[in-house]
Structure formats: structure tokens, C-alpha cells
């Protein structure tokens, strides 16, 4: 009997030791929740963390999956442009192209979801390339704020000859531009300077936001992503609500939630590269009548948008952090996250000292 109790005691000690070790790790772990509307750049940010603080490269299986997704991105985006060209009544530069339209439009949503293999893609790649070089598609693309299309489509259209090669192997940059809507919740842990950082990425579409509340426990910081270039676009769900207005509404709900009174919330005004392209072409005053700055200056537009989000906070004494980011730019994210990491660790230390 004594011997039996001795074995149980040893097992108990081992379990307690493991639990103590686990609790110690959990106390050190930084839990970051990525929030924001759909297509704001959350998943791209996680990919950057993988490149900067993870393995640096993606596995062969991951690359193969991304290759199929890139094929899907290119076909799907051209389908959108062809449909929009027709609805906008823009005539083909070369009328002969019309006979090729069905070869791209024949792909159903089901086909695209199942995946596109190389053999299928290579059949339509030259057609997609020809369409992209037609002035009608370029004119349609210039009016893309009127319909829903991925920001990354131009990148893939310009790389069609390379993507259509039999030995095409997506680079990290290709993968950063690759788009796939996040469904549900995904978690990624990276050890940075011996401290585990856990990133929780959840879908940003309205239908996915009910899942956000499952992630609200033990959060150290919230990184809230906004696609700053979308000031002249509407959301997919109702095709009426301005995307920046929608993002601000969501941010207001989060930043004023009592559950996050001790959680630092950092605003990422993302897609700064696309904002700089858009400002000279799209007058923000047409969408925000309260804009009083110089509508041709990127800086004025940037700070107008930041002020919109900053004004939604009720607790004015609470620190407000924001950064202008370009999620597909690895060096930009490396630099920004280095600064963000320091402020998060400092805030976490203060919180631990108060416990």
C-alpha cells in the first residue's frame, strides 16, 4: 500500500510540475487578437509574422495550396471584371475578344471553390492576359470602387506569363498577395526573443463577427486593421454602407467595450500604398462631406481618417496608438511590429505588476 501511494504521489508531483510550467508559459505568452472588417489585411499580417518571426519560408504543401489559390484568384478577378465591363457598357477595344469571354465566365463559384489545377489554368491564362491588355478591361478596373474585386488582382494579371509556367513555385511575395477569405478562427504562435506571441485571426465579414466573442478572454492586445484606401467603396454584404464607416462602427464597439479596459488597442491604417495611389484619383469629399483638408494630399486624408477613429473613443485618458502600414511590404511590417511589440510588452508588464 505504501508503495502504491508513493507512485501516486510521484505522478501527482509530475502533473503539478507540468501545470506549473504551463501556467508560467501562459503568464509570459502574449495573446494578440486581430480584428477588422473583411479584406483589411489581417491574414496578410499573419503571413508576414510567419516570414519575419516564423520559419521564413512556407512548407511545400502550403506552397502547392497557395499555387492553386493564385490560379483561382486570377480567374475569379477576371470574371468580376468581365461582368462589370458588361454592366458598365464599356465597349471592347478589340471586338473579337467577346468570343473568348465564355471561356473565363464558364467557371462557377463551385468550380473555383473546388480548386483550379495547372492544366485548367494554362488553358485560360493567355485569354486572361489578352483581356487585361485590352483598354476596355483597364477602363473597367479604373472604376473598381463601383464593384467588389480583390486589391491583389493587378499584381497577378501582370505576372500571368510567370504564373502559367509549369515550374511556377509561388514566392513569399506571391503568397502575400494571395487572397482567401478567413472562415472561423485560426491561431498562430511565434516565439519572438524567447517570448511566445499568439496571434488569433478571425474572419472580418459581418457573418463571421459573432465568433469574435469566443476570442475575448486572456487577450493582451487587439490589433485593429483598417483598409484605409476603401473610403470610396461599399461593403459586400449590403452594397450601401461605406467600408470605412463600417470599420469605424466596429472599432467604436470594440474600443468602448468594458471587457477591454485593460487591453491595449492598436489601430493599423493599412494598405497605405493603395491609399497613395487612390487619393489623386478619387476625391474623398464626395464620400465624407466633413473633410476640410486638401483632398489631393495623402497626409491630410490619412489624418482625417485617423481622427475619425480616434473620435469614437469615450475614454479620452486612455493612450491611443496608430500606425500607417502596408501589409504586403515585409520591411514596413517588420519595422512597425518592432515598435508595437515594445509597447505591448511594456503594457503587459504593468498589467502583471497590478495582479
From Swiss-Prot:
Keywords: GTP-binding, Magnesium, Metal-binding, Nucleotide-binding, Transducer. Disulfide bonds: none annotated. GO terms for cellular component: brush border membrane; cytoplasm; heterotrimeric G-protein complex. It comes from the Eukaryota. Residues 31-44 are annotated as: G1 motif. Residues 174-182 are annotated as: G2 motif. GTP binds at residues 36-43, 176-182, 201-205, 270-273, 327. GO terms for molecular function: D5 dopamine receptor binding; G-protein beta/gamma-subunit complex binding; GTP binding; GTPase activity; metal ion binding. Mg(2+) binds at residues 43, 182. GO terms for biological process: adenylate cyclase-modulating G protein-coupled receptor signaling pathway; Rho protein signal transduction. The keyword Transferase does not apply. SUPFAM superfamilies: P-loop containing nucleoside triphosphate hydrolases, Transducin (alpha subunit), insertion domain. Residues 325-330 are annotated as: G5 motif. Residues 266-273 are annotated as: G4 motif. Residues 197-206 are annotated as: G3 motif. Guanine nucleotide-binding proteins (G proteins) are involved as modulators or transducers in various transmembrane signaling systems. May play a role in resistance to fungal infection in the epidermis by regulating the up-regulation of several antimicrobial peptides of the NLP and CNC families. Upstream of plc-3, egl-8, tpa-1 and the p38-like pathway, required for the expression of antimicrobial peptide nlp-29 in the epidermis in response to fungal infection or physical injury. Belongs to the G-alpha family. G proteins are composed of 3 units; alpha, beta and gamma. The alpha chain contains the guanine nucleotide binding site. This is Guanine nucleotide-binding protein alpha-12 subunit. The gene is gpa-12.
